[in-house]
């Protein structure tokens, strides 16, 4: 194998390693983001139940009750 061929193989290995490591990190981040959004929705639903039934809270926080 010549030097040019060895260098090309080296670059391909580096590129493949970079692509695999960057895409696996994105999946984990997307999963955490989705979990955080779901948690926010659950807490908002709990606030809605308690606040919307109370007229004073409903008046003070119209953004929750809509």
Swiss-Prot record:
Changing residue 59 to A/K: In non-hydroxylated and non-gamma-carboxylated analog; no change in potency of inhibition of rat alpha-9-alpha-10/CHRNA9-CHRNA10 nAChR. Decrease in potency of inhibition of HVA calcium channels in rat/mouse DRG neurons. The modification 4-hydroxyproline is found at residue 55. The modification 4-carboxyglutamate is found at residue 63. Changing residue 64 to K: In non-hydroxylated and non-gamma-carboxylated analog; 2.5-fold decrease in potency of inhibition of rat alpha-9-alpha-10/CHRNA9-CHRNA10 nAChR. Decrease in potency of inhibition of HVA calcium channels in rat/mouse DRG neurons. Residues 26-47 form a propeptide. Changing residue 61 to A: In non-hydroxylated and non-gamma-carboxylated analog; 10-fold decrease in potency of inhibition of rat alpha-9-alpha-10/CHRNA9-CHRNA10 nAChR. Decrease in potency of inhibition of HVA calcium channels in rat/mouse DRG neurons. The cysteine framework is I (CC-C-C). Alpha4/7 pattern. This is Alpha-conotoxin Vc1a. It comes from Conus victoriae (Queen Victoria cone).
């Amino acid at each position: 194998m010549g030097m040019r061929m060895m260098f090309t193989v080296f670059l391909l290995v580096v590129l493949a390693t970079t692509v695999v490591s960057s895409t696996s990190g994105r999946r984990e981040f997307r999963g955490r983001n989705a979990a955080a959004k779901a948690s926010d929705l659950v807490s908002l639903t709990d606030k809605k139940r308690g606040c919307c039934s109370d007229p004073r809270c409903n008046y003070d926080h119209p953004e929750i009750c809509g």
